Amino acid sequence: LPCRVRSIEALAPDVRCIRLQLPFSERLEYLAGQYVDLIFPDGVRRSYSMATAPGTLEDVELHIRHLPGGHFTDRVFGVGSRPPLKEREIFRLEGPFGTFFLREDSDKAVVLLASGTGFAPIKAIVERITALQAAGSFRRPVRLYWGGRRPADLYHDALCRQWEKDLADFQYVPVLSDARP
């Protein structure tokens, strides 16, 4: 599928949220937790997990951490020799892929573990759980452990704390290896 960069937003000094717009006539069918491949004009592919549950947004949301020297991430952060990524730029998207997704028919507790931008598919899964709880079809305990070195690495900490208030039987446990700010 072709996709267009709708927006680029800083979530943390080294993390950006990129929203990709699909053609109006296309819908991407996927399960919360799956990933897509971005295919660049030179044929290089990069895989990124989608950070929104199906049906919550028309856009595909990706969380990108800067890896210095990275083919795509240097462009996202406007460093290196390639031109910086701009809104309205077009890429190809392929997918969905992956077997990491919420098993909605299970009766077992849900334990979610994430580190860094590995939070993206977890965010999509919790958004799906939110929709299921609102419909009255999800009654399982959920525990989310999100790890990082510093508090700033948990770039959606406030969102996780809001989920803890809003969702039934949901617990958020931030895990830091270096708690100094």
In which residue ranges do the predicted regions lie?
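Short, well-ordered coil/turn elements that cap or connect secondary structure elements
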Residues: 57, 85, 137-139, 165-167
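Reductase modules of NAD(P)H-dependent flavoproteins
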Residues: 141-181
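Phosphate-handling active-site elements
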Residues: 130-141
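Edge strands and adjacent loops of beta-rich recognition modules
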Residues: 1, 7-11
